[in-house]
A protein has these predicted regions:
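Active-site environment of divalent metal-dependent phosphoester hydrolases
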Residues: 22-27, 48-51, 70-73, 86-90, ...
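Cap/insert and terminal regions of metallo-dependent hydrolase folds
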Residues: 113-175
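Active-site neighborhood of phospho(di)ester-bond hydrolases with catalytic His/Asp-centered motifs
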Residues: 13-25, 42-46, 104-109, 129-135, ...
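Metallo-beta-lactamase
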Residues: 43-101
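A short helix->loop->beta-strand "cap" motif at the edges of active sites that frequently abuts
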Residues: 37-40, 60-61, 174
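Conserved beta-strand hairpin/beta-sheet module of binuclear metal-dependent hydrolase folds
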Residues: 1-9, 90-108
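Metal-dependent catalytic neighborhoods of phosphoester/phosphodiester hydrolases
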Residues: 28-38, 53-54
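Pre-active-site segment of Zn-dependent metallo-hydrolases
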Residues: 1-22, 29-34, 111-125
Length: 175
């Protein structure tokens, strides 16, 4: 998606920028390069340095890597990072908490029940806010030429239903 309208804002009051994974819809080099140098960029400490290296190459800035499943402090906010358990995805889930509020941001990750329990232990109960993706981040099935329009619509509906069922299962796991 285009992010050109972000450039119209003054972002100098940010305390930090967090990048969950290396997909370009989460890593906009033009936007990151426009930020003041004193705003740190935080990323998960993945086994691979791909994300770190990509940020350095695209922005000439060094991101700060945060270890996984350990508590970190960014300003006045505590955070902890989990990663998607799928071996093919390098994506992260960020959990933030203060003394009063908590947020679980699953970003593009699929989170397991055991991870949710661990996150709830970290924040001390149910989150005040759950951010979860309810739409697919790819163009399947619409860019696939082997499907006719009826098949594309059917596959698309199945995909949406699967996403919403997953979202509902996460919400039920929190209760």
């Amino acid at each position: 998606p285009t992010n050109h309208y972000y450039m119209e804002n003054d972002w100098s009051d940010l305390n930090a920028v967090i990048i969950s994974h290396e997909h370009m819809d989460h890593l906009d080099p033009e936007f990151l390069s426009s930020l003041p140098e004193d705003i740190p960029i935080y990323i998960p400490e993945y086994p691979s340095l791909n994300l770190y290296d990509k940020i350095k190459f695209l922005t000439n800035r060094e991101a700060k890597q945060l270890s996984l499943e350990k508590s970190h402090k960014i300003g006045d906010i505590n955070c902890q990072i989990w990663t998607e358990e799928s071996p093919i995805n390098q994506d992260s889930i960020w959990v933030f908490k203060t003394t009063e509020k908590s947020i679980i941001n699953t970003v593009d990750s699929k989170v397991t029940t055991s991870q949710l329990k661990s996150m709830m232990d970290y924040i001390g109960g149910e989150p005040n806010l759950l951010l979860i993706q309810c739409s697919g981040a790819n163009w399947f099935p619409f860019v696939y030429t082997q499907y006719d329009s009826v098949k594309k619509m059917k596959v698309s509906e199945q995909k949406k239903e699967a996403k919403l069922n997953y979202t509902w299962s996460v919400i039920e796991s929190l209760q």
